[in-house]
Swiss-Prot record:
Name under which the protein is recorded: Uncharacterized lipoprotein TP_0248
Lipidated residue numbers (N-palmitoyl cysteine): C24
Cellular localization per UniProt: Cell membrane
This protein's record includes keyword Nucleotidyltransferase: no
The entry's keywords: Cell membrane, Lipoprotein, Membrane, Palmitate, Signal
Signal peptide (residue range): 1-23
């Protein structure tokens, strides 16, 4: 298994990213690679969050959240990323992993891909959900 960080190849606007995903069988997880075109390094955090919320391309992995979920807000201050998800994330219409597992995998993916981010704080409907120790 190899890891790509959010790196720009030869100034082409092409970025490689790694995402941590939860397997549908026995709670396993793996790392999936993705190549994203046309995004700047500064927009990498938003792009990682967007890709995570879209879910995996392979049906053998559980979605982190319902595919219709869009963050109410997503911003960073210093080395911390704040993501506020709507209350609907608590009652998904599709098979997803638990919210705590979604948080763990999202945090791992964001920290791996976006070097300045060291902590992730999840909010649900504006209320604190999960946050890392940093």
């Amino acid at each position: 298994m190899w890891h790509l960080r959010c790196s720009n190849w030869r100034g082409s606007g092409v970025f490689g990213m790694c995402f941590s995903l939860s397997g549908c069988v026995m709670g396993q997880w793996c790392v999936s690679r993705a190549i994203v075109r046309g995004h700047t390094q500064g927009g990498a955090v938003r792009e990682v969050v967007r890709e995570l919320l879209l879910g995996p391309q392979h049906h053998g992995y559980a979605r982190l959240v319902d595919p219709a979920v869009r963050p109410l807000s997503c911003f960073s201050r210093g080395d911390t990323l704040y993501i506020d998800l709507p209350v609907g994330v608590l009652s998904p219409k599709y098979r997803t992993c638990s919210l705590h597992r979604a948080y763990e995998l999202x945090e791992r993916s964001v920290v791996l891909n976006c070097a300045p981010v060291k902590r992730v704080c999840f909010y649900v409907g504006g209320r604190a959900g999960f946050e890392s120790d940093g």
